[in-house]
Amino acid sequence: MTKQVRIVVLTGAGISAESGIRTFRATDGLWENHPVDEVATPEGFARNPKLVQRFYNERRKQLFSDQIAPNAAHFALAELEKKLGDNLLIVTQNVDNLHERAGSKNLIHMHGELLKVRCVKSGKIYDWQGDIGEHDKCLCCTPTQILRPHIVWFGEMPLEMEKIQTALSECDYFISIGTSGNVYPAAGFVREALFYGAHTVELNLEPSQVRSSFDECHYGKATELVPHYLAQFL
């Protein structure tokens, strides 16, 4: 393969599951035993900000556990970026930092990041590694405003969609890794890439909801599938 091949990779919870990151269980609508509308919607935050902050504080702490680390799939993507540079774009639905820890740099967190918070009024974003408490305020506003997790909740617009759609229109390969295919707009990316002529590939533990839109599908563990498939580009 030449260095000029352009690849967009979409990653979902499946790539981080083997690293020990707990995932949202869509089948029963629970996220770590919390109803989604309580902890992952703007309305839930308005009703009970303490509960929401506590929920994300616990998820943030999880990232610093000795048991959480990038796996072979994350490292394979980072290695491919060394060769392709800006011709590889990773778009992740995950809010963890495992891609960064593996070495990936050309990366879009379309659903936000656990290690960032933002002001509810100005939208100013801050790096944040500890807990968010009720006394933590954004000092950029007068009067001071509360901080919220820099997470895209249900009902909110994903981040950097214009950049993502441009990349989908220009890529030669679209590779989806560890995604369910039931969360939009990400589930529609494969059809966009197909429309513009990309070769589409699904690497998943099991078939996704949009498997029929892929030119090529391979099923198994991400830690095995991803390094093996990406080797052809190295």
Swiss-Prot record:
Zn(2+) binds at C119, C138. HAMAP family: Sirtuin_ClassIII. Its EC number is 2.3.1.286. The keyword Phosphoprotein does not apply. Keywords: Cytoplasm, Metal-binding, NAD, Transferase, Zinc. It catalyses: N(6)-acetyl-L-lysyl-[protein] + NAD(+) + H2O = 2''-O-acetyl-ADP-D-ribose + nicotinamide + L-lysyl-[protein]; N(6)-succinyl-L-lysyl-[protein] + NAD(+) + H2O = 2''-O-succinyl-ADP-D-ribose + nicotinamide + L-lysyl-[protein]. This is NAD-dependent protein deacylase. Belongs to the sirtuin family. Class III subfamily.
